[in-house]
Amino acid sequence: MDSNWINCPSVFSSSSSSSRRCQSRSDLYLGGGYEDLEGEDDLKAEFICPFCAEDFDIVGLCCHIDEEHPVEAKNGVCPVCTKRVGLDIVGHITTQHANFFKVQRRRRLRRGGYSSTYLALKKELREANLQSLLGGSSSFTSSTNIDSDPLLSSFMFNSPSVNQSANKSATPVTVGNAATKVSIKESLKRDIQEAPLSGEDQEKAKKSEFVRGLLLSTMLEDDF
């Protein structure tokens, strides 16, 4: 029990030192600081771990060896130059093959630069298309935008005339409808007047004419 507790600090210290080494590899990879070498683009991008035969890039390989094979790394074959290293494989790679870190960093920056440039161009193209659809700016109804867009200007200036012509065409229709209604009413009255009357209706008509005649004669006598 005591021996386990005694060995625990060494385990923690080895784990923390491994993390620090991995962080230093990442800092080395991100920071660069190496001179450009001729033919560096032709160098391999991935390497095989000499202990588990997995593929990694140069930084991933160093971190993998630090974390997964800290004991075996003290004596093994360098995956870059295939030479046997008796002390520290990761230290050998970072010192003797530092140009691979520079190549890896440059490739990463190239990929990031391409993607950022592509996104910027795509954004500009989208904004240009949107601007052309809206007439060039948010205040697309201004005189400048109307003059620059003949289709929009024709629509803006011709719309009142279209409305006026529509109103003019609607007015005769209304007058014609009223005249048609008047003619229909007159024809109905004419039909009623010309229709044959029954006996009772004829008697009523005679009585009404007699009463009307009396009233007219009375009014004429009063005037004289």
Curated annotation (Swiss-Prot):
Keywords, ordered alphabetically: Cytoplasm, Phosphoprotein
Lineage, top-rank taxon, reads Eukaryota
Principal cellular location given in the protein's record: cytoplasm
Q: Is Methyltransferase among this UniProt entry's keywords?
A: no
User: Where in the cell?
Assistant: Cytoplasm, Perinuclear region
**GO CC terms on record?**
perinuclear region of cytoplasm
Q: Where is the composition biased (Low complexity)?
A: 13-23
- Locate the Phosphothreonine modifications and list their residues: T117
Span list, region Disordered: 1-23
InterPro entries attached here?
DI19, Di19_C, Di19_Zn-bd
The UniProt PTM text for this protein says: Phosphorylated in vitro by CPK3 or CPK11.
Q: In which tissues is it expressed?
A: Expressed in seedlings, roots, leaves, stems, flowers and siliques.
Give the induction annotation: By salt stress, but not by abscisic acid.
Polar residues biased stretches: 1-12
The similarity annotation says: Belongs to the Di19 family.
Q: What is this protein called?
A: Protein DEHYDRATION-INDUCED 19 homolog 4
